[in-house]
Amino acid sequence: MKKRIPTLLATMIASALYSHQGLAADLASQCMLGVPSYDRPLVKGDTNDLPVTINADNAKGNYPDDAVFTGNVDIMQGNSRLQADEVQLHQKQAEGQPEPVRTVDALGNVHYDDNQVILKGPKGWANLNTKDTNVWEGDYQMVGRQGRGKADLMKQRGENRYTILENGSFTSCLPGSDTWSVVGSEVIHDREEQVAEIWNARFKVGPVPIFYSPYLQLPVGDKRRSGFLIPNAKYTTKNYFEFYLPYYWNIAPNMDATITPHYMHRRGNIMWENEFRYLTQAGAGLMELDYLPSDKVYEDEHPKEGDKHRWLFYWQHSGVMDQVWRFNVDYTKVSDSSYFNDFDSKYGSSTDGYATQKFSVGYAVQNFDATVSTKQFQVFNDQNTSSYSAEPQLDVNYYHNDLGPFDTRIYGQAVHFVNTKDNMPEATRVHLEPTISLPLSNRWGSLNTEAKLMATHYQQTNLDWYNANNSKKLEDSVNRVMPQFKVDGKLVFERDMAMLAPGYTQTLEPRVQYLYVPYRDQSGIYNYDSSLLQSDYNGLFRDRTYGGLDRIASANQVTTGVTTRIYDDAAVERFNVSVGQIYYFTESRTGDDNIKWENDDKTGSLVWAGDTYWRISERWGLRSGVQYDTRLDSVATSSSSLEYRRDQDRLVQLNYRYASPEYIQATLPSYYSTAEQYKNGINQVGAVASWPIADRWSIVGAYYFDTNSSKPADQMLGLQYNSCCYAIRVGYERKLNGWDNDKQHAIYDNAIGFNIELRGLSSNYGLGTQEMLRSNILPYQSSM
């Protein structure tokens, strides 16, 4: 008798809500201790044609209609095994059918197992022709994975495509623990579509039902399916109780959406958070529209505005079409300047000063590219501060390298600047910048000689109000032509450190750059897009002091620097330190009296910068950097970070960050640099830590203290319990959320979050500490 005993899979939930990916090794191995494994040789491929072996104490039959096997019945085919006290085999010839219908009844202590499931029950039935199967009052346990439960009746239909449960349950908790379970009056699992439908779904904690839904459709397996995701809740001082219930919508293979009703008790309404993702021939993108119909807190604080709708729109797109066209969108806009102070969003924060709305279309072929873009800014400032937008901007590059020993490039730009205020200057700027360079290099050094010409034309309009209120007058039409000459040389010396550390290698890399740019008075040009560039060691060797084109500082300077690196015997960099300085032969000027240090007439060694990295061991790392600017009469910026990392869940990091008030005034827009909260600069010390404190318990925390204000700048503490069938996470965060100009003090928001994660519904067994650290307002960054 060669017939296949069909595979009996226990339940849709157990087979579908488990994944092998992303398991944390320690906990995963512990959780497998209570899970049975398949210990027979695994048979691969189609087992339909394999023989069926039946062993029993007794057998009798009425050939060809039926046969009865009793006493320790053991039936095997391929990976499947069926054991019972009694098995009845029936065969009946149906009218008009070439093959007889063969069915099996199993009675008493029914035990079925294969490489996927173990099932036990008092009674079972199977149709050997159609593979339809029924099992009554069965207990099931998944093999090699978490998942078990019960069902009054389990049915398999459609060549094992569908598993149907009547009064079925599922839990991923190990045997002996029923901390949580999901129960449904009927459950249909479609393996081909990887979707589960549950009627009268009840979620239980222990024996107590705490959630009910008349119908649920859950995505299962790796195939994207529509359905509800795990809800989340937290409590904050700005919104009180908050609850999230995300729903995932699989619209098409190339697009999907997540719709999240977000209830905020203090706001008295539900914010609808709608995320849409897509993939087209023109690229991939993401759109987010968050909408709050009304906000009673905002209405109380801004009574003149009435019932205000609050919203956020975000659009990010990046794509290439036909290998030559580039499309990019980076667009963020909100209903009001207080939006990110009142609502948490991954598309902005309370520390952001503005939102950007940028669109660009580019065309690129060999040696040539062109981009047309528009850029606008939404400034989050209640002082009605103006801002400039580029509407539109054209950037063109043409390269012709290996022209003999030379490389050449021509860069061109045309842009029209528009201000948000009617009385501010506006301009059209056209810039042309041809460059020729002579690059020379070998394995121990390089020398690059470069010359360029920077020609810029400004046509400025709407100057009446500005010229009437300022001593320096702007000009309607300005032409500025500035040549630039640069020589940049670098050497690399290498030595074996066999005497000190066998197998280690040290390099010494001196670098010298001379830069010359003649002075041109730019006081007749308004500053539309230039700001002081932040400098580290590599920044010392930049051509420009300012970003943008409105301020190009004169230069007659030599930049010198040296870097040393140490590599171990595996060519891993263990240590480096870089120190450099800029020596000015003449004062660097633009003619703009608004730039403070241009009135100091300083020359000599003015700017110093240093960076260092030390990988002390496999677990210890140190990074540090400092910039000193004599034009600011102070250390401009500095930062240090010392980290001990045992693994991704065990780390301690100490941090220090400093920015002088003079540096802030020089780099930030005036409406921020002059604000009260920045008058003393930034001087903060802090620490972040993550560590398991007991079996399955872990803690994560961050604390930053501002020594200028003698107040905490940011605090975060999280505690998590992790087990085989659930995880509980509780978090507290106190973060800076704005500035009260009337009372002249910082505004803080306190948040308490609570999250439960059901194991078996997620493939992640990790402690979640990295996510908690990186979600902080001062996010963790590794020093290793």
From Swiss-Prot:
Q: Which GO terms describe its cellular component?
A: cell outer membrane; transporter complex
Main location group: membrane
The UniProt keyword set, sorted, is: Cell outer membrane, Disulfide bond, Membrane, Signal
Task: Give the superkingdom in one word.
Answer: Bacteria
Question: What happens to this protein after translation, modification-wise?
Answer: Contains two intramolecular disulfide bonds.
One of the GO biological process terms: lipopolysaccharide transport
Instruction: Indicate where this protein resides in the cell.
Output: Cell outer membrane
Q: List the disulfide bonds.
A: 31-724, 173-725
Signal peptide per UniProt:
1-24
- The reply to whether Signal figures as a keyword in the UniProt entry is yes
Q: What does this protein do?
A: Together with LptE, is involved in the assembly of lipopolysaccharide (LPS) at the surface of the outer membrane.
The similarity comment for this entry is: Belongs to the LptD family.
| PANTHER family xrefs | LPS-ASSEMBLY PROTEIN, LPS-ASSEMBLY PROTEIN LPTD
Quaternary structure, from the entry: Component of the lipopolysaccharide transport and assembly complex. Interacts with LptE and LptA.
Q: Which HAMAP family match?
A: LPS_assembly_LptD
- What name has this protein been given in UniProt? LPS-assembly protein LptD
Recorded source organism is Salmonella typhi
Recall the taxonomic lineage recorded for the source organism. Bacteria, Pseudomonadati, Pseudomonadota, Gammaproteobacteria, Enterobacterales
